[in-house]
């Protein structure tokens, strides 16, 4: 036996007067007694707040405010709390013996609005030993405690093992948990449910008959039949949808051609533009790629031209530099030629001057000889004149001396004097101061020897002098010759120089003889050197052109390679034309083939599109025509099989629908005739009585009653007996059972229950064994379960039927499509894919184009290589003969060596040429140079010195001899000279003096003559010398000029210079022609580059424009593709056959479709606007949006419950298949769904009867309730008269109003409302719509009127009104009604709650003192019988012997207010238990 949950205690923490107080609640009645303001209402308010923590509902007022709509500002809660955290908790033990602490944390909110903050929470699993106050407070001293905050409470609870704390943010969650745990009687899902519960508690608290309860007693007592309402709503929705679908089908049938036209024209309009844009995009892409290729090729060509221009500019610079060098060389060569010519002229002048000089030299030599001879004669004359002069002087001196010695004495005296003079003179001359007459002999010998030596020297010098005098002229001539040859030479070195010159003259003459051979050799070598330089220049040019350095030794092998390469390139160039022609022919063939395939491709694509559709529709793949024809035969067989299966499903479906219709009868009557019989007999169907039987009990009762489960229960069988005789329309077996339908039980049969079966003793000798049915149908729950399974099965069969019907239609359509396909496309569909072949051929064409372009490039490159190779070969042919020159590394050295030798030989030649004759003249005179002409003078001086020395020696010897001779004279000191002895000598001397003077005069005359002649000769010599010197100077100048010219003026020099000049002129002309050619080529190249740059700029501009168009088109195209793919219309729009049409054709196609579309969408504003927007050619995505809008429009028009596809095109294709089938099926479905008005009336009546029976059962519990004069209380339930009329018309006169119920424009609810208005025209419906009124009429509660009646005194049964009853009677009557409501709620929520949970029952009653003792006892009895807890408040203990009583006294102590509580347990049945506690 499941026990009912109970409230164990109520705990208040920090309430006004209650710091921490727990009230243990009695299992029946808990009484709160005390005076006014003791805290009774506060305690109940705390209980109600913990039970319903909704500030929008809580309003605690006094009983004096019972009728008021508003109370105090704080609604009675704020003033009951103290500052800080407050708690109100309920300790509950439910049917599962689970202890649950539910409560709220309250806290005053500061402010003038006096608000209160409430937080609900629960604590589960709290041990029994722990009291709520222990968990909510914390002891801080011996007599002090602190209230915990909610967070601290949560932390403390979480520390306990097995205890759960849960805080709630919504009251719904809080009440949901309380319902699941059995704390509240019903699930409070919404604020309306909470309001009803609060109104119930409030009515109980303040007592009396609550008008809020009685006015809406139906809402409190009668459960909402949501299942019936939902069934009606679902039925109406299904009917509405069915009718809308049928209407949509009819509209679709009427609009089918419009749909086809719209989708066809929209597809043509958009697909043509889509494919045109696709084609243009491809064309633009190809154009952009072509422009990019042209751009790249032009850039490459420009780069090549720029490289060529750079190379030519470099070559031009080189040529210009070379031209400058050549011009310089040419100018130098011209200048050299001029110099050579000048030198030749100079050489001629030099030769003339040389000839003149030779002649002058010869004349000058002759004149020199004449002058020399004249000078010698002059010298002789001078010597003779001097001798004559000397002789005159000596004679004069001698004459004078001899005159003085005329006297002997005088002579002796003179001799002595002379001896003395001689001695002094000897001493002076000999520088002998010691000389005396005595030692004079000794000194005389030595001085005589000196005199002898001096004489010998003088003789030798005289000899030399005579010889020198003889060779003096030749020496001067030879010295002049040496000076002429060697320049200024020391006279002492003249002989050595002359010897060297004569010795070198032979080699000089040999070298001079080698000049011409060396010149020829040098000319030859210089020619070879120039050729070598030209060859090196050619080799450098060749290497530069070929980009590689070559050695001369490699040229022969390179020539062989070049020859082989030229031969190869020549063959390649020769083959290039044939190869290119072959490629061109293949390209033309491919283009012709592509044209043919392009013509055939649309036909093949259309066939493939049809084949793809057929493959998608059939799910098969077809490889050849045989498979297509075989599949057509299979389609015929499949159609026959599917038709048979569909008919079988239809039969099964009809059977199930019959079962559903039979089980759907009201009251569980499978035969509608039984309802009529039950009404006729005034009975009730047994199935109706057991209509509320649970699903678990249904098999038992079904087996218990067996075939009689469809019996009619009547109150008296005898009254029915007479009516049985005339029965015609009734089942074959009709069971009648006597019993009270209001209190029927199953005691009719003696029954024994077995395992899944029962044995029923029908009579003494008749038993019936019935097994529990596998699918019970007894009771509403069993029938609903069976109906649900049957409906599911029916839905499955309906779906199968629809699928099979669709398959049949689809197969038929598919067969027709195959027939059309065979007749139209079978001939071409299995051909090879022309597009694949086109792609292959296009790829091959691209390869051929690239091959031809590459081939042309390679051919051009080969031609260039061929030309380069030929040019290189030509250069090599020039170089090959010069390899030996290139390899001759010593040529330059030899040229320099020969040039040095030639310089030497030319120098020698010039020397011989200049001095050859002089050397010839010098050769016989060289010996005379041994004596220097200046040495002749020296010799003369030496001779004069020797003569002086000899004279001095002679004088010294003479002086000594005179001293020696006059040694005797020293004795003549006293002698006188003898003058007479020398008289004859004087005469001789005079005579000789005369002769000498005459000779002297003659010599002087001759000297003057010779002097004049010498002067003449000297003048001639000077003239010749001057002329010779002038010509010599001129020759030197000419020679210097020739040397300054620096060229050799030989016979071949001019020819070589002219040849060199001509060669340089030719090279310069060639260079200039090459430069002019390069300039022309550079000009052409620059023009080509300018053209290419202009072309490049144009290409770049066109490419960027094209690329911008492509990018812009790509952005638009991406938007288009995104729209297309996101909406799945690519397959419809990407019609490949349109890709082969021209843009103008596609534009024309789109324009034609546009015109048709304008007419087609003229009545549709949305499509018309979208179509107008789509006409913008710059926004192609808008056409797609229009197509999508058309699709969406068609999707909306073709609903998914009609056509099973999202594609309107496929929907249109399926439409003809589906429309007829759906029309037929939906018509049948409407007939099936449309419930009859009689059925509706029966359902409402049976529901009313069921609820009336339930109210009667509730009334049985109120029969023993008595309060004061009230002996009994009951609920009276009556059907309203207007609604009874409506039910009668629905069940019996529905044919009269079929215009309402058969109208497709009205739902059943609207038709019901219209019928109600038709039956009750006097009733004002206000602003409510027929649908709202109809929905109200489908709710059975609106058919009933409920009122509370009391049996009071002599008045009998009266309507319970507060005015007709005393306060106690009203309180008791109201409490009875509330108990009935709570009990009704529990039964109503039984299915929602766990089977092992029976909820707590608790009500309140304030001011219970108004009840008398009998009423109190009745109330206590009611609580005991209904297992209900009651909390009452009274000024005094009204029933101390029962329940638990708390005496509350409010006291004030030291400005602190608290309530003193004394508890007393009832002593009527057990010993009293008194407890006292103060808080």
Swiss-Prot record:
State where the protein is found. Cytoplasm, Nucleoid
Q: Which InterPro entries match?
A: MukB (IPR012090), MukB/SMC (IPR050308), MukB_hinge (IPR032520), MukB_hinge_sf (IPR042501), MukB_N_dom (IPR007406), P-loop_NTPase (IPR027417)
Residues that bind ATP: 34-41
Where do the coiled-coil regions begin and end?
337-418, 511-603, 780-810, 847-1116, 1206-1265
Q: Per the record, which residues fall in region Flexible hinge?
A: 666-783
A GO molecular-function term, please?
Answer: ATP binding
The Gene Ontology biological process terms listed for this entry are:
cell division; chromosome condensation; chromosome segregation; DNA replication
- A Gene Ontology cellular-component term: cytoplasm
Q: Which UniProt keywords apply?
A: ATP-binding, Cell cycle, Cell division, Chromosome partition, Coiled coil, Cytoplasm, DNA condensation, DNA-binding, Nucleotide-binding
Q: Name one Pfam family in it.
A: MukB_hinge
Q: Which family does it belong to?
A: Belongs to the SMC family. MukB subfamily.
Task: Quote the record's domain comment.
Answer: The hinge domain, which separates the large intramolecular coiled coil regions, allows the homodimerization, forming a V-shaped homodimer.
Question: Tell me, what does this protein do in biology?
Answer: Plays a central role in chromosome condensation, segregation and cell cycle progression. Functions as a homodimer, which is essential for chromosome partition. Involved in negative DNA supercoiling in vivo, and by this means organize and compact chromosomes. May achieve or facilitate chromosome segregation by condensation DNA from both sides of a centrally located replisome during cell division.
- Subunit composition and interactions: Homodimerization via its hinge domain. Binds to DNA via its C-terminal region. Interacts, and probably forms a ternary complex, with MukE and MukF via its C-terminal region. The complex formation is stimulated by calcium or magnesium. Interacts with tubulin-related protein FtsZ.
Q: What is this protein called?
A: Chromosome partition protein MukB
Which organism is the protein's source?
Pectobacterium carotovorum subsp. carotovorum (strain PC1)
The taxonomic lineage of its organism, from the top, reads: Bacteria, Pseudomonadati, Pseudomonadota, Gammaproteobacteria, Enterobacterales
Q: Which gene encodes it?
A: mukB
